[in-house]
Amino acid sequence: MFKNLDAEQARHGFTNLDMAQKLGISRVSYESKKKSGKFTTFEAKNLCRLFNCKFDYLFATEEDRR
């Protein structure tokens, strides 16, 4: 769903398990949230801090790019 999130995760060499641990959730929960796009505000802020990226970039969707 979020190609930039996927790209940053890959660029930093983080697995889904790594990401889940950084957010304090299970790997299955992280994968579900990534697929559905339903991160909490707290989780989204933490991901932006982790990758030093703005929210609009990290969570851009295909629809946003049109």
Regions found by a protein language model. Give the residues of each.
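DNA major-groove recognition helix of helix-turn-helix
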Residues: Q9, K34, E43, E62
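Recognition helix of helix-turn-helix/homeodomain-like DNA-binding domains
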Residues: G24-F39
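A short, Lys/Arg-rich alpha-helix, primarily the initiator
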Residues: M1-F14, D18
